[in-house]
Amino acid sequence: SAPDPTSDVGVAGAQQFILEKTPAWVNKYGKDTAFFCTNDAQTEPLLKQVAKYGAIFVEPDLPSPLMGYPGAFGIDLTKEAGNWPAIVKKVEAAVVKAGGKGRMGTWAYSYGWSTTCALAEYGKRIVEGKAKLYNLKDLWKCYDKFTPGAAWNGAPYFDVAKGIKNKKLTLVYQDTYVFGKGYMKATDEAVPEKYLTIK
């Protein structure tokens, strides 16, 4: 647990806490500990310390090479703006140089950007009769159009309490790109049905 940046310590205090505590956490739990945060103000200091002390950072909470990495490693992406493969290449070089090779990742294309583009395309194709509503293969083709090289997967939301799938809500994910290694191929893995019954 860490201080809330909206509390009296502010953003600076919350960031300082992460900078100071991460080395102790790595020492206590080991370098094979995966760190994660949902507080955007704490992402940059966490990335810095994870790289410096050799721990693992799978991906940001809103996965994107723009989420925390440029600020944490002083990366200027002015020339690469709008070019996701070039952005990933430059961020990857900085992460590897900082010591995060094979231990830090992200989605190669911003979650927000790619989902906005894909859903607009999906709606367009449905109206044109080129895609069917609730057809995941058609949806993945729309994601693929805007995210070459990245794989996508997902499934309709399953309400465990009611025991039903809700086809109107699809949980999607892009394969994680690990800097210095490439894609994890996590989207190739099938989630066993038995996990739909865990309460």
Question: Model regions: which residues?
Answer:
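A residue-level marker of the well-folded mature domains of exported/periplasmic proteins
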Residues: 1-199
